[in-house]
Amino acid sequence: MHRFATGLASKARLARNGANQIASRSNWRRNYAAKDVKFGVEARGLMLKGVEDLADAVKVTMGPKGRTVVIEQSFGAPKVTKDGVTVAKSIEFKDKVKNVGASLVKQVANATNDVAGDGTTCATILTKAIFTEGCKSVASGMNAMDLRRGISMAVDSVVTNLKSRARMISTSEEIAQVGTISANGEREIGELIAKAMEKVGKEGVITISDGKTMDNELEVVEGMKLDRGYISPYFITNQKNQKCELDDPLIIIYEKKISSINAVVKVLELALKKQRPLLIVSEDVESEALATLILNKLRAGIKVCAIKAPGFGENRKAGLQDLAVLTGGQVITEELGMNLEKVDLDMLGSCKKITISKDDTVILDGAGDKKAIEERCDQIRSGIEASTSDYDKEKLQERLAKLSGGVAVLKIGGASEAEVGEKKDRVTDALNATKAAVEEGIVPGGGVALLYASKELDKLPTANFDQKIGVQIIQNALKTPVHTIASNAGVEGAVVVGKLLEQDDPDLGYDAAKGEYVDMVKAGIIDPLKVIRTALVDAASVSSLMTTTEVVVVELPKDENEVPAMGGGMGGMDY
């Protein structure tokens, strides 16, 4: 009887606890973010304010006499830069709708930077010019879709005109001129990039790193460079420079760790039989196997060295396969039923010389079949085109460079960290612009190619008046790069634009650095076609979208003073 009563009491308590929890849940607040909705002219006006403020901050960097921008950082010293995309990325507004406009301009700058690597400032000021005129036209009753159609027709016409006037470049001097312009007139940077391209070719990888001196330097690594050094310093053959140097070596490439002494002995016998040095590339060499290699090197005088395979996962596999193709060997992998104890001479690669330091390995003049190497390069190029990941593209580009030529490193020097950082931004822009110029050719610089293309739009036929206004919006926008460059140099921009449009020489422009009118191509003031084409197309695309916007939905900021509702009583606490 007592047990029965205790059971009932227990069930009653459980029921009461359940009721308390249900009551508690009914008191919970659902804190969904409230939205603010802006319509029509108000929405576009606020977006335009964000676009204008961001563009005004970016445009001061344009041209040879553009100014720098100082950006506060959450950690470390403030960043000093003259790079448009860096300035754009750093700007965030408190007003949410204003921020939407700014974010869309950042999108333009990033898209232009991703495709062409330069021209972000040009893209930003073009976006502001097109969107400003578009907003005025829509507010005065124009049809937004017809305006958009007119803008699109005008851009297509300008791009066709620019392509017809582009000139391909090939000489080192022309490459240096493009680099100099993008580096804000610093001739040394332009020449450094031209030398790097001459050394590693147009497809070669050119990287930028911090230098250790006050001067800018170029270091070129020919052949394949692996970012792995010797496993043990006992492999060193040249005590003076602390490197292991192997001439005409055999190269064994193994995918896994080497732990078996028998496997090591088999490989050493092959090298001894041929009286040639040996390089072992594997995931790792474990202690007993490593000791065997070192003893044979020290006591038997066999020139041998072991390095770890660079990279991780699929990248490591692909890198080893590249090395095998370059040296004419095979990757020994258990997946194909191969092992080290059954290795024969045909599986080993070779090259003219290998130099191994504690940090890296350089393989010169691999013995691989030229046709096989070219096929491998084509395969990697296809992978680059198909890839959507920036990281994957970068890794594939590195692999291609290692196979096809070499790697050039631009070491940027300076008196302080801030100076080096600012110079690196300019060198990156210059390098990207140079690659774009080699790819699609050049046009007269200083904004004049766009300015003169605006003349051609007078003849463009349109279906109605609103489309004609869309064409005129682009015509006016194309004048802004020259206007901005002149204004930043302390000259009245409208006067410069007017004077250039009065005459008919398509190469005449305003040299803002010297303050005179010159033949831009002869003066070496040139722009890559790819850069200005991408800037215009991206700017027009996003501006058109913003012009046709009728509603903007943003989250309302949370009220920091709002106190959340208290939960109900906790179940199971009655005694």
UniProtKB/Swiss-Prot annotation:
Matching Gene3D superfamilies: GroEL, GroEL-like equatorial domain, TCP-1-like chaperonin intermediate domain
InterPro entries named in the record: Chaperonin_Cpn60_CS, Cpn60/GroEL, Cpn60/GroEL/TCP-1, GroEL-like_apical_dom_sf, GROEL-like_equatorial_sf, TCP-1-like_intermed_sf
CDD domains documented for this protein: GroEL (cd03344)
Domain of life: Eukaryota
Stimuli inducing this protein: By heat shock.
Transit peptide: 1-32
GO CC term (a single one): mitochondrion
Protein source organism: Cucurbita maxima
ATP-binding among keywords: yes
Keyword annotations from UniProtKB, A to Z: ATP-binding, Chaperone, Mitochondrion, Nucleotide-binding, Stress response, Transit peptide
Family label: Belongs to the chaperonin (HSP60) family.
Function: Implicated in mitochondrial protein import and macromolecular assembly. May facilitate the correct folding of imported proteins. May also prevent misfolding and promote the refolding and proper assembly of unfolded polypeptides generated under stress conditions in the mitochondrial matrix.
GO biological process, one term: protein refolding
Localization: Mitochondrion
Name of the protein in its database record: Chaperonin CPN60-1, mitochondrial
Molecular function GO labels: ATP binding; ATP-dependent protein folding chaperone
